[in-house]
Amino acid sequence: MIHSIGTDIVYIPRILRILQKYGEKFLNRIYTEKEIELSRKYNSQEMRARYFAKRFAAKEAFVKARGSGQGITMKDIEIYNDVRGKPYLTVSKDFISKIHLSLSDDGDYATAFVVICVYSSHR
């Protein structure tokens, strides 16, 4: 059953400016080591900004779906893709619900949509 939803949109040039100004300091505050490592496959700053903007949107969308950011940091939330490219979101804290994630980008914007589902043991 759907428990909650969250969505977010990020202006990619803003992330690019932040990357240019703060670099690793910004990345290390928001993203996991794995997310940062996976971004290195992109050769241009613009592609890295697009990659990080989608992940930032996903993290924000999850916090909105959860209803509160208390007790969780952006680094507790990790976004990765399976071998076919489907995005997934995991949370390092105990979180037993199923999380569905959709990411998209077009032009200057990246978006994310999160659905949190809970499964009842009563049928």
Curated annotation (Swiss-Prot):
It catalyses: apo-[ACP] + CoA = holo-[ACP] + adenosine 3',5'-bisphosphate + H(+). The keyword Cytoplasm applies. One of its GO terms (biological process) is fatty acid biosynthetic process. Its cofactor is Mg(2+). One of its GO terms (cellular component) is cytoplasm. Transfers the 4'-phosphopantetheine moiety from coenzyme A to a Ser of acyl-carrier-protein. This is Holo-[acyl-carrier-protein] synthase. It comes from Wolbachia pipientis wMel.
